[in-house]
Amino acid sequence: MTKYVFVTGGVVSSLGKGIAAASLGAILESRGIKVTHLKLDPYINVDPGTMSPFQHGEVFVTDDGAETDLDLGHYERFTSAKMAKRNNFTTGQIYDSVLKKERRGEYLGKTVQVIPHITDEIKDRIKAGAEGADVAIVEVGGTVGDIESLPFLEAIRQMGIMEGRNNVCFMHLTLLPYIPTAGELKTKPTQHSVKELREIGIQPDILLCRADRSIPVEERRKIALFCNVMPEAVIECLDADSIYKIPGMLHEQMLDEIVCHKLNILAKAADLTVWENLIVALEHPLHQVKIAFVGKYVDLTESYKSLIEAIKHAGIHTRSQVNIIYLDSEDIEKNGTGVLEDLDAILVPGGFGRRGTEGKIAAIRYARENKVPYLGICLGMQLAVVEFARDVAGMPGAHSTEFVQDTPYPVIGLITEWLDASGKIEKRTEDSDIGGTMRLGAQVCKLGEGTLARSIYGAPEITERHRHRYEVNNTLLAKLEEKGLIVAGRAPGTDLCEMVELPADVHPWFVGCQFHPEFTSNPRQGHPLFSSYVKAALANQKAKGK
């Protein structure tokens, strides 16, 4: 029978519920417990796929093609659990499902209400997502007190009764703000947050208290007494310089023991050796490199969360401190590429919209002409093809039809047909809806023999996750290949171009990939493409005699 840990948050948002939930999952997994994670999002959007990165941050893509909350990325990076569509759902999805059932007559003419119909749908989805796990860690998005969260909180309250006391644990993350004029941490916001939860009918078993300094023993006792939890269950969560230290911090305070005791689980002792080794590698690098990250949303790095973490993972596995220099592509458009001169490698990530594209193309041109290691991901690959077409293949004005419909050389165009993960044919037109209409999820890619990509991956065939509508135009690909562009990877069956590179005698390391390799990187194994990229940056640094 699956047991549940429900994670809620109070006082303010963005306290790190996702990191706390992922860290608990990592500790429990090290004890031999099979865990999974769910994220319940109270917003009415169907998914974050069409939301602005400035509103929501990164959209994390799963193997089965779900566009999900970025917290699912944390769950996959911290544990071995694979996330899927069932692991993340929103108010929009819940209401959509209930309304469709009502239209089909499944409620037999009853008045459809929030309780029981919406809450029952939430409970059913939680159970479906938790199936097969020993422990399901369920994070409820938002902040206690928000009106949007109420149906979700009511649903988990009901599960607390229905599943039995030894099968459910409630963990509440809260904030203890420090008031400089008073010279102390304030517990009152936490007390009020717990009071809100208890009014709903949920009594937290564990309190995770975020603070920027150590919480005095007396304050912890006060919190325990006024919030009706055991003193040892008031866990101190101090700010850390790396999220990968959090599992160790929580384990030191016996969080996993408290959870196992509450859920009546007998398990072996936790072994966090792998996390300890990661921290050693992170804190004692042997090298340093500087990478230019040329993007559109660089003021909000949460938009590139998985990519930034993947670069950090590569640093861990190459014993390198990777210093990411964030550069706004619009600034490069206005001021030129001088800012790139002192850097060891250049990266252009995925993105949407025309704004800043010429700045990215200028950065790509600089990388190609100056033999600076270059990695282009999704749009970063497409713009590398555009730059090559314009400046090498003799196609002036070449562009993507996403940005210029009447370009004389549409080297990038809308994918009109492809096979999805199940082998079903997907079709799109320019008039298709924006939401949920991209080529999404895990896709197979065949790597060409003798290519750099093949040597990096060490395999003839790979599977990576996609999120895009546009692809290299096969009708113009032959001319690009004639001029020296190497198509290093293709999708079997459709022959879509998935990876490009330049010959070794032209450029030491120039790779573009249509997929998003960052979605499958984790701190324990890293990812071969990012590790190779950082090694290329180190080699470039050495060649320049730095």
Swiss-Prot record:
UTP binds at residues 13, 186-191, 222. CTP binds at residues 13, 146-148, 186-191, 222. Residues 1-265 are annotated as: Amidoligase domain. SUPFAM superfamilies: Class I glutamine amidotransferase-like, P-loop containing nucleoside triphosphate hydrolases. Its EC number is 6.3.4.2. The active site is at 378 (nucleophile), 516, 518. It holds the Pfam family CTP_synth_N. One of its GO terms (molecular function) is glutaminase activity. Allosterically activated by GTP, when glutamine is the substrate; GTP has no effect on the reaction when ammonia is the substrate. The allosteric effector GTP functions by stabilizing the protein conformation that binds the tetrahedral intermediate(s) formed during glutamine hydrolysis. Inhibited by the product CTP, via allosteric rather than competitive inhibition. Residues 290-543 form the Glutamine amidotransferase type-1 domain. InterPro entries: Class_I_gatase-like (IPR029062), CTP_synthase (IPR004468), CTP_synthase_N (IPR017456), GATASE (IPR017926), GATase1_CTP_Synthase (IPR033828), P-loop_NTPase (IPR027417). It catalyses: UTP + L-glutamine + ATP + H2O = CTP + L-glutamate + ADP + phosphate + 2 H(+); L-glutamine + H2O = L-glutamate + NH4(+); UTP + NH4(+) + ATP = CTP + ADP + phosphate + 2 H(+). Pathway: Pyrimidine metabolism; CTP biosynthesis via de novo pathway; CTP from UDP: step 2/2. Keywords: ATP-binding, Glutamine amidotransferase, Ligase, Magnesium, Metal-binding, Nucleotide-binding, Pyrimidine biosynthesis. One of its GO terms (cellular component) is cytosol. ATP binds at residues 14-19, 71. L-glutamine binds at residues 351, 379-382, 402, 469. Mg(2+) binds at residues 71, 139. GO terms for biological process: 'de novo' CTP biosynthetic process; pyrimidine nucleobase biosynthetic process. Homotetramer. CTPSs have evolved a hybrid strategy for distinguishing between UTP and CTP. The overlapping regions of the product feedback inhibitory and substrate sites recognize a common feature in both compounds, the triphosphate moiety. To differentiate isosteric substrate and product pyrimidine rings, an additional pocket far from the expected kinase/ligase catalytic site, specifically recognizes the cytosine and ribose portions of the product inhibitor. Catalyzes the ATP-dependent amination of UTP to CTP with either L-glutamine or ammonia as the source of nitrogen. Regulates intracellular CTP levels through interactions with the four ribonucleotide triphosphates. HAMAP family: PyrG (MF_01227). Belongs to the CTP synthase family. This is CTP synthase. The lineage of its organism: Bacteria, Pseudomonadati, Pseudomonadota, Betaproteobacteria, Rhodocyclales. The gene is pyrG.
